[in-house]
Amino acid sequence: MDTTLRDGEQTSGVSFAAHEKLSIAQALLDLGVNRLEIASARVSDGEFEAVKRVASWAERTGNIQKLEVLGFVDGDVSLNWIEAAGCRVVNLLCKGSYKHVTEQLRKTPEQHFADIRSVINQAIERGIAVNIYLEDWSNGIKNSPEYVFQAVDSLRDLPIRRFMLPDTLGILNPGNTYEYCKEMVTRYPDLKFDFHAHNDYDLAVANVYSAVRAGIKGLHTTLNGLGERAGNAPLSSVLAVLKDQLGVDTTLREERINYASRLVETFSGVHIPPNKPIIGEHVFTQCAGVHADGDSKNNLYCNDLLPERFGRVREYALGKTSGKANIRKNLEALGIDIDENSMRKVTERIIELGDKKEMVTTEDLPYIISDVLHHDTMADQRIRILNYSLSLAQGLKPVAALKIEINGEAYQESASGDGQYDAFVRALRKIYTDLGRPFPMLTNYSVSIPPGGRTDAFVQTIISWNYAGVDFKTRGLDADQTEAAIKATLKMLNKIEQ
């Protein structure tokens, strides 16, 4: 079960709009997730409308039983909310530790169990299926196991689909996760259990591994590991561990995980760390030249986590640790062949740039080669920016006027935009549209400057593009941010002409 849309949305600063929830739900089901927890009942009017929208789509497509909503032991209040939203499964939040019952609810276990039974009976009468969370189960099984067993024993005769065991405060480790889960599975072999990990000690994935080894059949995850505090077990890591480390067959389509993860990154505003396993930007990038050389010799530096499994490709970084093998791999991708002497000079220049902490992309290579081999960089360009003017005035939209040359022909256009660079790109698009030429889609835009906060520091702008289904990046470096972006854009224009 994926809970990105419920627990994941409890990440500080994250809130999904209705259309975003629907898009994420569709991506998760396309990925092969079996169940989705899409909301908590009673949260807000906006959440209610979002759940209605997702449920309406799920009803039309035959997926309504895959949607679940967190509900509370509150009589019929949560059930009314869930039913009105169009959902058919409640995940009832019950207390899984004696301390929570007596100190938070200020009730006896018997009173709490009676309240739970009442809600479950109402749900069944309405045709709403029931799973139950034993909230704070990890503390409960550790400090008051007799209460946990009493709770399960008093409720097991009811038509509960799954008993869900959350490590609510993320206190478990792989050793006691196995011990406690094994105890539940052994004691109640006829019941279905889920394990819900939290990542407070950075052990969520390891604990999932132990839970499965102990016999747990249901797992809770989130895309990108979003969730309360340190988050939940990330779906990307869990799917790889299940297949490679445990040999477990699932319905998950690995090649879809990167798309779903990037979608959530965009909607949540929470960036994926570049070194995050499976989905991080750098995890399929070889930096050391010896690794690239080994990859050319029967994949000596590859493990089972091949990037193609996850809809990605292996890359070879260019920097001070690069060797000729790294550079050759990137030149092959560009269809460029140079002799050994030229290769040595290019390698030296890339190492020099790396020492200065400058980022070198594949698309920079033709420029570096031209520079190193004393060619006229502009001579090989099919697209030139002849001149341009950018204006910014208080109370008025920025305006850009530009003149470019394409294959020897000059074209001129102007446009306004929400910023100077936006105006520049809009003017470019006008020219390309008039010529019937496709224009790449800008997918990401990042700016960085060296530490120190100097106003005259060089700005590095890295722009990600998608053209004809192919993703690539271009880089511009200048003391002016807009100039840096324009340089990156010019590289893009010539890149697509190759």
Task: Place the predicted regions along the sequence by residue.
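A mid-to-C-terminal "edge-of-domain" accessory segment
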Residues: 2-4, 247-414, 454-458
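Short, ordered loop/turn segments at secondary-structure junctions
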Residues: 5, 40-41, 72-74, 94-97, ...
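Alpha/beta enzyme core
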Residues: 7, 11-36, 57, 61-62, ...
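Non-catalytic terminal/interface segments that mediate subunit docking, oligomerization
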Residues: 10-11, 15, 20-24, 29, ...
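Short beta-alpha connecting loops at secondary-structure transitions
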Residues: 101, 167, 221-228, 240-252, ...
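Catalytic alpha/beta core domains of metabolic enzymes, predominantly
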Residues: 169-172, 179-296, 301
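Mixed-charge, glycine-accented linear interaction segment located at domain edges/termini
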Residues: 470-498
